[in-house]
Amino acid sequence: MVKKWSVSYPAVNGVEQRRVYVYLPTMYEADPERRYPVLYMFDGQNVFFDADATYGKSWGVADYLDYTDTPLIVAAVECNAGPNNERLVEYSPYRFDDPTYGHFDGKGQATMSWFIHRFKPFIDRNFRTLPDREHTFIGGSSMGGLMSLYALLQYNDTFSRAAALSPSIWVSPEKLSGLVGRAKLEPGTVLYMDYGSQEMGNHEGMRREFACLLYTSPSPRD
C-alpha cells in the first residue's frame, strides 16, 4: 500500500507543495504492534508509479517489496523538476560550476535539514517506525545518489545505511573527498554504491576512484 499526499517543502525559490509517498508493507495492518525500519528516498515521483515517473518508468519499489514480503516502510518526496535545473540546486550539498549548466548555489544542506528535522519526525509520529539510527536508511540515484552518500557521511548519527546508485560525484569530488576524510562513521555503517560501465564522460572512473577512497579510509569509530 502506498499513501500519497502533499507537504510544504523549502524549495529553491521559497516554499512549495510537494508530493510525499509512503509505502507500508503488506503485514502493516495485520499486526498493529509491529514496528518497521524506514528507507527514505529522493526523487519520490520515480519510486512507485509509472504514471508519476519523470520518464514514464518507475523503479517499481512497491511491487518488489510486496512480492518479497519485505518488512520495510519507504518514505519518498518528489524533487523539483523545473525547467531551469532546480533539481541540481536542491540535491547538491555544495556550490559548483559546470561548463554545461553554469553556476549553482547548492541547497542540499537545507534539503537534508528538512528531511532530518521535519520529514523524519513526521513519519515517526504518524507511522509505526523503528526511529533509531540502526533502522533508518536513505537512498537515491544520480543527484539523489549524491545526496544519499552525503547524508550517510555527514549525518551518520541519523542514517546507518545508504544506497547511492550512480551518484553524481562530479558535482564536487574534492569536497566529497574531504568529507570522507573527516567523517566519523559508526560501526556497522553500510554503503551500497554502483555505477554503469557505459555512463557519459569520466563518471565511471571518478566513481571507481571514490569507491577506492571510501574503502581505504580509516573512518569508522573505535
What are these regions (language model features)?
Residues W170-L214:
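The feature captures the conserved acid-bearing segment of alpha/beta-hydrolase catalytic domains
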Residues E78, L165-S166, D194:
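Alpha/beta-hydrolase-fold catalytic nucleophile elbow
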Residues D50-F104, M112:
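Active-site machinery of serine-nucleophile hydrolases
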Residues M1-P37, L72:
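A domain-start/cap signature at the N-terminus of enzymes
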Residues Y215-D222:
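Conserved small/polar residues in nucleotide/adenosyl-binding loops
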Residues E134-S177:
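Primarily recognizes the serine-hydrolase "nucleophile elbow" in alpha/beta-hydrolase
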